[in-house]
Amino acid sequence: GRFQFVDSNTGVRQNLTPNAGVGTPQYDGSGGCTRSDDYHCFGTADRYNFAGQNLLLTPSERKGVFAQFRYYFNDDVQWYVKALGNRRESTNQAAPEPIFLGPDAGTGNPLADNIVISALNPFNPFGFDLDSATNLIQIGRRPVEGGPRRYEQQVDTQYFGTGLVGTFEGAGRTWFWDVKGMYSKNKAEQTNYGSYNLYNIYNINLALGDPAACAAVAGCVPLDIFSGAGSITPEMLRWIQPVVRDRSQNELSLFTANLSSELFQLPGGAVSFAGGYEYRKYEGAYQPDPLTVARRYNGLPSLPTSGSYDVNEAYLELNIPIFA
């Protein structure tokens, strides 16, 4: 962890991290980087190496089925049906998600930026409140105890289309026509493991506050972000680490009709004609997890959204060969 604050007792600005291997670090309030307590000045060597947690090959599994049916009523008219179903299951992984607290953390989430950590927190080694309004600058703690961030996706795609295709004779020429309808849907769900519920971290009366207030709330466990790796227990993680699910879907409905033929001959060739109509309707929706909507999730906040629009299109084409 990294702790940047102004000591309320001495007025000294600190930028510290616990020494390696220290279970319960002791703080003596001394300034500078020559220290007699269990901390040292934060430096480049203390930064986290992401490489070990990233995946070179992203797991992905696809399952699909496709079916097609075609029926000839006669030589001039045929009917077809196409259907498709596909499922993708994939996983992304990133380094353990950091917890950033304080005004310089820059999370954009007031639950993190405006935090107050009580001196009564049993794991607070500094002996005074850490208050974003007065002396707290920034706290950064990467809870390696919670494991890497994992994003599991399940994406289902369905497609169904049917139509008629044919020809007919009229006005001394052959006409080609087709009509079809189609519906497709793409539905996705992403489940995020390894993130943090900032509401429980923020509340001074709960995980980082007075232990008596925390004890009065079912499931609350005082949180230790002040010690080194291993200080956050499974019980603490269960209180602050939710499973976040975001869902989205897109739908497309389509109808189209087309007609074409050759109209007459010129020295350069046949003048041909094509015309048609197409209707499309697009629908989409995104439903983030309630924790995300409530701005209690450590990631970027977002709101549910949905919408749709229709498109009506018609076209007319002529192909006129000018030169032979």
What are the functions of these language-model segments?
Residues 310-323:
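Structured alpha-helical segments in the cores of large, soluble enzyme domains
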